[in-house]
Swiss-Prot record:
Its main location: cytoplasm. It comes from Francisella tularensis subsp. novicida (strain U112). This is Octanoyltransferase. Belongs to the LipB family. Gene3D superfamilies: Bira Bifunctional Protein, Domain 2 (3.30.930.10). GO terms for biological process: protein modification process.
Length: 206
């Protein structure tokens, strides 16, 4: 397996990072190393490529950005650990379904290993849940065998803006965050812990 570079981008506007993902993916070659980007975004709603406007109930002047990822509308904001996967999935011998399950399982493993939290998935509703409340959302895009976008883990943030939308297209979906269970939750630690679990699973799948 090739090297995977980690880039900690800090706090960055969503639009800028989205544009950078598109550029990286469109210009990469078979020799380009895979990258994982760790980032935090100012408040923004992002709409998936099949997103329906009626799922945004009231934006409260929070910007709305249309993207090409899978899924419906979600919210990003400070205190949320976002991890983007810029991978050559063909080179890593991953199909789209395997990539999704690896992204999900890494989050489940992280929450169990570091926080003793038993998380789960729900059939037909991608994401990670604790007691049927969503703690992590994912949306990916694969273009010509290359992935981008990723997972957002609610860590230590204001969850109120999720009530302004139907998160991921589900009316009344309850959200939670790591800080509900672990007051000292820190996004930098979560990003590093998650990435370690993801890379371990990826290596084991090769």
């Amino acid at each position: 397996m090739n090297n995977i570079y980690q880039k900690d981008l800090g706090l960055q506007q969503y639009n800028k990072v989205f544009e950078n993902m598109l550029e990286f993916t469109s210009t990469r070659t078979p020799e380009t190393n895979d990258e994982i980007w760790l980032v935090e975004h100012p408040a923004v709603f992002t709409q998936g490529k099949h997103g329906k406007p009626e799922h945004i109930l009231n934006s409260h002047n929070i910007p709305i950005v249309a993207t090409d990822r899978g899924g419906q509308v979600t919210y990003h904001g400070p205190g949320q650990a976002v991890i983007y996967f810029l991978l050559d999935i063909k080179r890593n011998k991953l199909g789209a379904k395997k990539l999704v399950t690896t992204v999900e399982q890494a989050c489940i493993n992280m929450l169990d290993k570091y926080y003793n939290l038993k998380a789960h998935i729900i059939d037909g509703a991608h994401g990670i849940y604790i007691n049927n409340q969503k703690i992590a959302s994912l949306g990916l895009r694969i273009k010509q065998g290359k992935s981008y976008h990723g997972i957002a883990i609610n860590t230590n943030m204001d969850l109120t803006p999720f009530s302004y939308i139907n998160p991921c297209g589900y009316s009344g979906l309850k959200m939670c965050q790591l800080a509900n269970f672990y007051q000292e939750a820190d996004i930098k630690k979560v990003q590093q812990q998650y990435t370690a679990e993801f890379v371990t699973l990826l290596n084991n799948s090769i």
